[in-house]
Design a protein with these regions (language model features):
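Divalent-cation
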Residues: 1-134
Length: 134
């Protein structure tokens, strides 16, 4: 399975779903874009991290990072792994120093967590072929 690296291109309110946001990812070495509709709270968490804003109290994704580091777990990468019936699936690839493991997550949560750990975001060709736009 060849992984394709993505980067965040933009985040805006969704034209099609009220109260939702469109997170637009793009191929790092290509022209295709991958739009994903996400919720308001996840969009806020992603935007806060992109803008390097420090909230007064930790958000859920900040808490996850603190907990993971406290117990010796590091996030290695985020993988948007599948698209089934219009729903994206992703994995957070982690390591505890002796073994690597995957956590199933919504892409919005995986990306919010991945941003906090400063890791790369990937997808696979089948997802980009089905949902990607040029």
């Amino acid at each position: 399975m060849k992984k394709i690296q993505l980067e965040i291109l933009g985040l805006s309110s969704s034209q099609s779903q009220s109260g939702s946001f469109a997170l637009v990812l793009g191929e790092k070495e290509g022209n295709r874009r991958l739009p994903i509709i996400i919720g308001m709270f996840e969009a806020q968490s992603i935007a806060i991290q992109i803008e390097k804003i420090n909230p007064n109290r930790p958000l859920t994704h900040d808490l996850f990072k603190s907990f993971a580091l406290e117990v010796g777990v590091k996030v290695r990468e985020v993988l948007i792994s599948d698209l089934k019936e219009g729903v994206f699936y992703s994995k957070i690839i982690c390591s505890n120093g002796t073994q690597e493991f995957e956590l199933d997550a919504r892409p919005s949560d995986a990306i919010a967590i991945g941003l906090r750990f400063g890791v790369d975001i990937y997808t696979v060709e089948s997802v980009l072929s089905e949902a990607g736009i040029i």
